[in-house]
């Protein structure tokens, strides 16, 4: 009987160790993600986050674990997004490191899972926003530059149409 109990205990320890290793592999994969990842419990408290999320939101593992995420991110748009429980779309908000001279834009999306838990994904879209602004400016400038010569040509054609032309 004692041999059987020992074998069962060893098998259980082996399964526990394998589960722990799988969990560590999973957390390492989340840590390597290019996106910020935050796991929230059913009350919105932080259970885990990766380094990217720490830099996006100014989080500290010693200080902020089990704190309510909405209390740490004081962006009114995010507070409304979080309270609405309508997570079909993402939210654009300023990052923690944003300054007037160096704005940082984050795309934040909450995904419900499990028993009321939330997965928060964030990504820095600053470069994307800047590229879109440059594209808009370029299109506006090009359309203005094209419109000006076309206006001159249209005026020239109108002038030619009003002049009496000889049959020569």
Give residue ranges: language-model regions.
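Conserved phosphoacceptor histidine of two-component systems
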Residues: 140-144
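Sensory modules in modular signal-transduction proteins
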Residues: 11-57
């Amino acid at each position: 009987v004692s041999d059987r109990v020992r074998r069962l205990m060893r098998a259980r320890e082996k399964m526990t160790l394998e589960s722990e290793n799988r969990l560590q592999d999973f957390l390492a994969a989340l840590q390597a993600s290019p996106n910020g990842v935050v796991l929230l419990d059913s009350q919105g408290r932080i259970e885990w986050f990766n380094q990217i999320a720490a830099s996006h939101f100014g989080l500290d593992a010693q200080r902020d674990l089990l704190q309510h995420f909405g209390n740490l991110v004081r962006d009114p748009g995010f507070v409304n997004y979080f309270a609405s429980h309508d997570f079909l779309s993402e939210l654009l908000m300023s990052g923690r490191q944003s300054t007037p001279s160096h704005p940082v834009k984050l795309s934040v999306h909450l995904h419900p899972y499990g028993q009321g838990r939330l997965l928060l994904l964030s990504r820095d879209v600053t470069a994307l926003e800047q590229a879109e602004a440059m594209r808009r400016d370029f299109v506006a400038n090009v359309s203005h530059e094209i419109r000006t010569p076309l206006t001159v040509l249209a005026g020239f054609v109108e002038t030619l149409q009003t002049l009496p032309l000889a049959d020569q």
